[in-house]
Swiss-Prot record:
Species the sequence originates in: Escherichia coli O6:H1 (strain CFT073 / ATCC 700928 / UPEC)
Cofactor (UniProt): pyridoxal 5'-phosphate
Coiled-coil ranges (or none): none
Gene name per UniProt: hisC
Enzyme class (EC, first level): transferase
Protein name: Histidinol-phosphate aminotransferase
MF term (GO), any: pyridoxal phosphate binding
Pfam families hit by this protein: Aminotran_1_2
EC identifiers of the protein: 2.6.1.9
Annotated GO biological process: L-histidine biosynthetic process
Family matches, as InterPro entries: Aminotrans_II_pyridoxalP_BS, Aminotransferase_I/II_large, HisP_aminotrans, PyrdxlP-dep_Trfase, PyrdxlP-dep_Trfase_major, PyrdxlP-dep_Trfase_small
Pathway(s) this gene product operates in, as recorded in its UniProt entry: Amino-acid biosynthesis; L-histidine biosynthesis; L-histidine from 5-phospho-alpha-D-ribose 1-diphosphate: step 7/9
Disulfide bridges in this chain: none
Length: 356
């Protein structure tokens, strides 16, 4: 009887899988971390719940109610999970049959849609965006057969722009009765007028992903939300873990979503937008920067001369950016998280010193 290695025992799709390269996984030794779109400083919270001997609620009532009120939806339309990343995976697990169904997404965009599908053994189809990074609706229409979930990130990571709302409507009409459309609104707090939350009544197949990692400054909490109609939420509840949120996470999330927590978040957003405009203006004057793209988020995408050399030079100086060269249509591009004024100045000074 022949023996097999542990790796041989693993599923073939897992053996072939390239894991998502998160900012932390990519490493680096820096003082200026501008590669993960985090808020630059920590927000303090005190735990109020000490019942750590008991299992938590699956869907903590106060968290759900606070988020529903904030988002302008009913509590029955909210699911809380371990980051929006878990929401991405739950939607695939609930709606896609491995080896039969597919998801569709439009690169350049967030990398977890493909990783989540590939892990489960669900086909990934891609329709690259147009030159202006808007949706190729004809291309999507041509590839929809067999697709159960379509992911659209708006504002899009890493490009920073909003998807045209009329294109969203067209996509929702194309997919009606065929597939779930997922609007990933991880960065919507920086442009709240563009949220699709008000469209849920009109489109039963729309789902929206949200997070506390960006504007709420709680990336370390791992707390995200899916907004959808009750029928979708009930299906997701069948596949979510029994205790997705620990008691301390639920405690802090509820505080962050209190009226005063929302006010504080909006103050942070205003500060980041001011800093973003300062950094954009400065980048446009730097010789090694070829192009700075408009942003509706807390990060800036820019195209550089000799971007790999620039990236490494700043890395060696302890300034960690995110290289986007491998993404479709993003040759020469680096993504810069908007940090503090001091961090912005470090980036500006380092880039001005580049001889390329």
């Amino acid at each position: 009887m022949s023996t097999v290695t542990i790796t041989d025992l693993a599923r073939e799709n897992v053996r072939n899988l390239t894991p998502y390269q998160s900012a932390r996984r990519l490493g680096g030794n820096g003082d200026v971390w501008l590669n993960a779109n985090e808020y630059p400083t920590a927000v303090e919270f005190q735990l109020t719940q000490q019942t750590l001997n008991r299992y938590p609620e699956c869907q903590p009532k106060v968290v759900i109610e606070n988020y529903a009120q904030y988002a302008g939806v009913k509590p029955e339309q909210v699911l809380v999970s371990r980051g929006a990343d878990e929401g991405i995976e739950l939607l695939i697990r609930a709606f896609c049959e491995p080896g039969k169904d597919a998801i569709l997404y439009c690169p350049p965009t967030y990398g977890m849609y493909s990783v989540s599908a590939e892990t489960i053994g669900v086909e990934c189809r891609t329709v690259p965006t147009l030159d202006n990074w808007q949706l190729d609706l004809q291309g999507i229409s041509d590839k929809l057969d067999g697709v159960k979930v379509v992911y659209v990130c708006s504002p899009n990571n890493p490009t920073g722009q909003l998807i045209n709302p009329q294109d969203f409507r067209t996509l929702l009409e194309l997919t009606r009765g065929k597939a779930i459309v997922v609007a990933d609104e991880a960065y919507i707090e920086f442009c709240p007028q563009a949220s699709l939350a008000g469209w849920l009544a009109e489109y039963p197949h729309l789902a929206i992903l949200r997070t506390l990692s960006k504007a709420f400054a709680l990336a370390g909490l791992r707390c995200g939300f899916t907004l959808a109609n009750e029928e979708v939420i009930n299906l997701l509840m069948k596949v979510i873990a029994p205790y997705p949120l620990s008691t301390p996470v639920a405690d802090i999330a509820a505080q962050a979503l209190s009226p005063q927590g929302i006010v504080a978040m909006r103050e942070r957003v205003a500060q980041i937008i001011t800093e973003r405009e300062y950094l954009i203006a400065a980048l446009k004057e730097i010789p090694c920067v070829e192009q700075v793209f408009d942003s509706e988020t807390n990060y800036i995408l820019a195209r550089f001369k000799a971007s790999s050399a620039v990236f490494k030079s700043l890395w060696d100086q302890g300034i960690i950016l995110r290289d986007q060269n491998k993404q479709p249509s993003l040759s020469g591009c680096l993504r810069i998280t908007v940090g503090t004024r001091e961090e912005s100045q470090c980036v500006i000074d380092a880039l001005r010193a580049e001889q390329v």
